[in-house]
């Protein structure tokens, strides 16, 4: 646990008592704060009270006397479509609102660091797609090359549940737009921006607000190094804002398709090869073809971002290459779960938006596509240029009929459920084809989250093997 600094003898309120909220309360208490807490769920409140938390109904004005700050758990709306009533009350009373990410950054450095030979560092990763894989890959590279490292944030362990940093340790964090938007302190040593595509727009008031939330990771004087995916205009804009010209090597531009030779520092992938350029000269190259944990162009973009971040903390190219080959990938992200009768079955349940689905569809030559769920704003008409490899679509969930109207001449069948989709695809798929779950939609109409959706798909496929 990382005790929160600067809260001794203050009364701090915590809103939301899931795993993150309870960890935040414990870290605040370890830092000497008096912690009061609230959650909208009766069962959650009862559980928290049994664990010794002091509950206080923060919906009542009279209970705010003496509260110095409100710490909100991830996922609780703090601005759009409208703030949670407790957060709105804090705003009205002038009580500062923060989250566990802000507390982490103000508490990460300790007096013990004066005895360290090498100062601990933080690499923080944000973006729309690929950030979990990029974060996990950076952590894997560090671990495989013998660097002390921890991973947390939106992946793995909550930030305040991490251990205090050791000498020379590198902490790798995945940060969502919800987390970066609210945090009052964001000071990573290396910040990574993978890409931007429309997502969570209702929570940010539109695409501009969503991008602004991501950009906050690069504010406050900026990180020592910024790794920026420049395949979208927002990334090119951000790189231009952070750098003092094309030759500034504090910004490492990355791409999966563009040749980036005229910059101070760049990493890009073309035709299956990763290249690193410094001041116009190629200094390293890696053959990405055949690396099983990084299939497809979208994973080559992730590899470029992870490579750049690892280089920014001093890892040598050949060490990174060796780590690439031992990376197993993450569940629900281009995960091959079986090959049955010459047909590959791939779980990309994390492809919850159009951009992620487009990248998944580009990775295979002949696809039987399972798509649908809770559709997002704008539908999937933008996928039209990506549907050439699709032999047939099997449409499930709330958006099935809407998706059927948006996929042009692509053959389709509305099957409603995952069980039906897997059964129909199994009956019709031919050797050499890939059955791909890349829903281009959220899971909440039929599943609690994308993980449960992917686990259900995987279980159904495994049953075919039995």
Curated annotation (Swiss-Prot):
Protein name (record): UDP-N-acetylmuramoylalanine--D-glutamate ligase
Predominant location: cytoplasm
GO biological process, one term: peptidoglycan biosynthetic process
Gene this protein is translated from: murD
Keywords, sorted A to Z: ATP-binding, Cell cycle, Cell division, Cell shape, Cell wall biogenesis/degradation, Cytoplasm, Ligase, Nucleotide-binding, Peptidoglycan synthesis
Pathway where it operates: Cell wall biogenesis; peptidoglycan biosynthesis
Entry-linked PANTHER family: UDP-N-ACETYLMURAMOYLALANINE--D-GLUTAMATE LIGASE
Summary of the function given for this chain in its UniProt record: Cell wall formation. Catalyzes the addition of glutamate to the nucleotide precursor UDP-N-acetylmuramoyl-L-alanine (UMA).
Enzyme class: ligase
Residues where ATP binds: 127-133
Reaction catalyzed: UDP-N-acetyl-alpha-D-muramoyl-L-alanine + D-glutamate + ATP = UDP-N-acetyl-alpha-D-muramoyl-L-alanyl-D-glutamate + ADP + phosphate + H(+)
Places the protein is found: Cytoplasm
Protein family: Belongs to the MurCDEF family.
Cellular component, GO annotation: cytoplasm
């Amino acid at each position: 646990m990382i005790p929160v600094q600067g809260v001794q003898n203050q009364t701090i309120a915590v809103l939301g008592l899931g795993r993150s909220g309870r960890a935040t309360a414990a870290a605040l208490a370890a830092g000497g704060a008096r912690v009061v807490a609230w959650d909208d769920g009766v069962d959650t409140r009862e559980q928290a009270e049994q664990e010794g938390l002091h509950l206080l109904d923060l919906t009542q004005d009279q209970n705010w006397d003496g509260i110095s700050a409100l710490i909100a758990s991830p996922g609780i709306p703090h601005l759009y479509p409208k703030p949670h009533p407790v957060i709105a009350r804090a705003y009205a009373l002038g009580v500062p609102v923060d989250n566990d990410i802000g507390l982490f950054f103000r508490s990460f450095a300790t007096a013990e660091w004066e005895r360290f030979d090498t100062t601990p560092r933080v690499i923080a990763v944000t973006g729309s797609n690929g950030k979990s894989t990029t974060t996990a890959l950076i952590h894997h590279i560090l671990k495989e090359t013998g660097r002390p490292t921890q991973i947390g944030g939106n992946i793995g362990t909550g930030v305040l549940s991490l251990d205090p940093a050791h000498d020379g340790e590198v902490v790798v964090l995945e940060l969502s737009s919800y987390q970066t938007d609210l945090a009052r302190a964001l000071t990573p040593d290396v910040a990574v921006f993978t890409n931007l595509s429309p997502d969570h727009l209702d929570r940010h008031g539109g695409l501009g607000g969503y991008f602004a939330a991501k950009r906050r990771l690069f504010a406050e004087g900026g990180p020592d190094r910024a790794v920026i995916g420049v395949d979208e205009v927002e990334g090119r804009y951000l790189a231009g804002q952070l750098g003092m010209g094309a030759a500034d090597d504090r910004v490492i531009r990355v791409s999966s398709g563009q040749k980036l030779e005229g910059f101070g520092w760049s990493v890009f992938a073309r035709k299956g090869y990763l290249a690193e350029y410094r001041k116009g000269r190629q200094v390293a190259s890696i053959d990405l073809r055949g690396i099983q944990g990084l299939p497809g162009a979208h994973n080559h973009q992730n590899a470029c971002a992870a490579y750049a971040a690892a280089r920014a903390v001093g890892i040598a190219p050949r060490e990174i290459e060796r780590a690439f080959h031992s990376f197993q990938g993450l569940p629900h992200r281009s995960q091959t779960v079986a090959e049955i009768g010459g047909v590959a079955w791939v779980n990309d349940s994390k492809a919850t938006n159009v951009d992620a689905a487009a990248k998944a569809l580009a990775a295979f030559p002949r696809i039987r596509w399972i798509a649908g769920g809770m559709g997002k704003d704008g539908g999937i008409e933008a996928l039209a240029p990506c549907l050439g490899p699709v032999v047939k679509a099997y449409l499930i969930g709330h958006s099935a009929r809407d998706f059927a109207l948006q996929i042009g001449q692509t053959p389709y069948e509305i099957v409603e459920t995952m069980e039906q989709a897997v059964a129909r695809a199994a009956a019709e798929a031919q050797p050499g084809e890939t059955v791909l779950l890349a829903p281009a939609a959220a899971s909440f109409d039929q599943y609690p989250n994308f993980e449960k959706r992917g686990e259900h798909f995987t279980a159904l496929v495994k049953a075919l093997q039995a």
